[in-house]
Amino acid sequence: MTTLVVHGGAGRWAVSEEKRQAVKRALEDAVREGLAAMLRGGAVDGVVAAVEYMEASGLFNAGYGSVYALDGRVYMDAGIMDGKTGRAGAVAAVEGVKSAVRLARAVMELTDHVILAGEGATLLAKRLGLTAPFYKFYSEEKNRQFSQVLEEARQGKWHFKRVLDFADTVGAVALDKDGNLAAATSTGGVWLKLPGRVGDSPLPGAGFWAENGVGAFSATGVGEVIILSTLSLRARDLLEQTGDIRAAVEKAVEYVTRRFGPDTAGLIGVDARGRFAFSYNTRAMARGWGKPGEVRAEL
């Protein structure tokens, strides 16, 4: 059964009703874009189209909406995995790229590597025509938030769990009509990160995983926690053991909560039969899902 699930990040989502509705519409539209791409191609096309739509929206902490590092610059991470081939591609700490997930796909399909970082990833983006003007990554709203978190840091009030008040990684998982699975995740990281910091989003087994016959997963939350818990691979193993996608994602997030505390992670997953689930230990998680002719989203 053709199925696509997206997330727009786990966290507080304490936003205005106007933004809440805009985010919900963006999630629904991302699912529609992904489903349309899947009908033309397959699962990989679907997750790329869905994530790219969210990157371009500017509403999430990915693509044009990416947050600022400590030096005031924007560095993005993204990763993708093809469940049919077992191949993955990712980019880390890349600047000025219009779609980090498209660049990650290029790494997967056009190179022998899994991850490209920093200047090397940016150079590949230039060669592929995937760069964008730097001004597109800055806005008055983000400038205001940057000033706010800088002041909190000066007062000693800033800590990693606070990133989920502001940050909302995006991701997608899909099962296509041929039974192929794919997963993708994209993010701008966390406010005030040190330049060069890499989170979970470009790391297979942490921020994403896809494997035909088993399932596909995309994570969101505090990157360091997701890396240390190998969240997506943990969910994959639980799914293989239990055969229950809901139990797999819930138990994986429960492990994170026991080990690292609440307000740290969220996860979406789909299995080889098109059954899907999501779990999170935060106040909320933006998510959308659908199949041809049926699309829904919630915050």
Curated annotation (Swiss-Prot):
Substrate binds at R197, V198, G199, D200, T220, G221, V222, G223. The active site is at T169. Autocleaved. Generates the alpha and beta subunits. The N-terminal residue of the beta subunit is thought to be responsible for the nucleophile hydrolase activity. Transmembrane segments: none annotated. Gene3D superfamilies: (Glycosyl)asparaginase. Pfam families: Asparaginase_2. It catalyses: L-asparagine + H2O = L-aspartate + NH4(+). One of its GO terms (cellular component) is cytoplasm. The keyword ATP-binding does not apply. Divalent metal ions and EDTA do not have significant effect on enzyme activity, indicating that activity is metal-independent. Displays activity at a broad temperature range and is highly thermostable. Optimum temperature is at or above 100 degrees Celsius. Shows a half-life of more than 150 minutes at 100 degrees Celsius. GO terms for biological process: proteolysis. Optimum pH is 6.5. Catalyzes the hydrolysis of L-asparagine into L-aspartate and ammonia. Also displays D-asparaginase activity, which is about 20% of the L-asparaginase activity. Does not exhibit glutaminase activity. Belongs to the Ntn-hydrolase family. Heterotetramer of two alpha and two beta chains arranged as a dimer of alpha/beta heterodimers. The uncleaved protein forms homodimers. This is Plant-type L-asparaginase.
